[in-house]
Amino acid sequence: FKHYLVAYLNCSLAQKLVARRTSGNAQPKLNVGDMCLIPIPTFSDAFYKVISNLIINSENLIAASQEKYRYAEKMLVSTIDMVDRSSTKIITSLKSLSESFLTSGRLDAEYYQPIYDDYKAALKTEDTVYTLCNLYDKNFVPKDDVEYAYIELANVGNSGDINDVDSVLGKNLPSRARRKVKSGQVIIASVEGSLQSCALITDEYSGALCSTGFYVVDSDYINPESLLVLFKSKPIQALLKQRCSGTILTAITKDEFLSMPLPKIEQSVQKQIATKVQESFALRHQSEQLLENAKRAVEIAIELGEEKAMKWLKGKNAEV
């Protein structure tokens, strides 16, 4: 029954009932007591079992997707020294003026922590984001009467996927929605605390808009999937964090981003990473489809009856 409950509470009908019970202005919330008053339609055990199987299969596909992505990360680790250096015993660093401010323009002590020097040494590269990547930072002005898929920070998943993107009329878009993306590009969040929010733009979101809070890049030397895994790797994430600056909103500037070290990856390894990431994304898409089928089946059962819902699900299974 618990899996059916998950499907029901996520379907559009239940969400409307939840919204109706939500109260408050500055911080709308749903009280436990109000949640208990939301009606739950009941059906046969056979229907519950079908919905449960869909949810369980969806969870299994997500687990398989995550495993594929972890394998891609391991492929990258095999070519780059990514030993965990967070436990380094050296916590002090002495730098002369010529080695510090006159070179980097930075006076904050955090920037010169030895751990960052360790990561730079581990990458063993003279290349940077500037030499290996193309940066797309030209503003796009949306048309008022055209709908655009708008990718926000909250739409970026842990494995570099994008989901739950809303379509918004150009006139209703926020002023920061000024980057138009295309398939094969990678977006990287620029604000400290969200640097791990990197995503690969797939065909589904080609032509979408994203916030100016993302850097949009691709590369002539590194395929999109490998670029995604690289930017989400521990050394690159550490170097992104090192280069952040600011007071109210700490972020990495364009100059700091472009000058950040970035290693090349062997073509044979890139191909293997690309295959695993593509497989991961495909499995995640299948998982999402099963969840949608479960939610839609519950909606049909409520609106038209359980028999109609079961028939609809059989048709969906026949399509697979």
Regions inferred by a protein language model and the residue ranges of each:
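Non-catalytic DNA-recognition/assembly elements of restriction-modification systems
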Residues: 44-142, 266-320
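A short glycine-rich beta-alpha junction/loop motif
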Residues: 24-46, 194, 208-215, 246-269
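Well-ordered mid-protein domain cores that form the structural environment of catalytic cofactors
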Residues: 5-22, 39, 232-235
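Sequence-specific dsDNA recognition surfaces
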Residues: 130-139, 154-183
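Short coil/turn segments at secondary-structure boundaries
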Residues: 20-22, 87-91, 142-152, 242-244
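Short amphipathic C-terminal alpha-helix that caps PH/PH-like domains
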Residues: 5-11, 54-58, 72, 227-232, ...
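Short, surface-exposed loop/turn microsegments at beta-strand edges and helix-strand junctions
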Residues: 142-148, 166, 179-181, 200-212
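A short beta-sheet element
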Residues: 1-7, 187-231
